[in-house]
Amino acid sequence: MAICDITIKKDIAPSCDDPIVPGLEQEGVIMNRADVDFGAVTFNATRKNVIETLALKTGKKGYKVQVFGATPFTGTNTTLATGTYRNTFTNTVNMVVLANDPDVCNDIIDGLANGDFVVVLENKAKGLNKTENPGDSAFQIYGYYQGLKAAEIGNDKYSEETEGGWNISLQETKVPKSALFLYKTSYDATKTLVETLTKPAE
């Protein structure tokens, strides 16, 4: 039986050359978790919180999710969940759907209410000035381990924020790692990989 490594391995200090910045970019990708080809997913050989290949089953595709404004996906966060024998993490991904018509309710809202999802979001802090693996912190994956499920969905006709659209909060619990990143050789190569997720897999 393997012994899990629970030690820290690096100095705790901010990077002066590549300081972290808050926030997310305005566009991400959401996938039905059942469409992910887990058998084709590959992790980095030494960094097990880095996925190098995220594949979908043949004929399946992900969908763009765009949230505009100064703070897109506001409220998206990761928090510690203490357990009896092991601590885990809870991921929350928030988004808004600025529409409310029969097609949106049928094709988006009803699905979000009952499905399991994987979401890829792009951090504004990309780590592009790192000496090794520049850009490896740009794309973060949520929902891979347990699936993101609806925690809150609401439609307020007089909301100043959604203007009659939908507020969505998805949550993933019992996550074994603090973060999971998507990175394949470079930032540009990874961005291309993310873009291919919205096209039917071959």
PLM regions with names:
Residues 28, 95, 119-121, 170:
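Generic structural hydrophobic/aromatic packing signal, biased to beta-strands
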Residues 80-103, 161-177:
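Oligomerization/assembly interface segments of phage tail-like spikes and tubes
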Residues 5, 44, 129, 194-196:
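A detector of low-complexity, intrinsically disordered, Ser/Thr/Gly/Pro/Ala-rich segments
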Residues 141-202:
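Mixed-charge, glycine-accented linear interaction segment located at domain edges/termini
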Residues 106-140:
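Short, acidic/charged, Gly/Pro-enriched secondary-structure junctions
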Residues 11, 33, 70, 98-102, ...:
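Generic structural motif
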Residues 102-110, 180-181:
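Short, conserved charged micro-motifs
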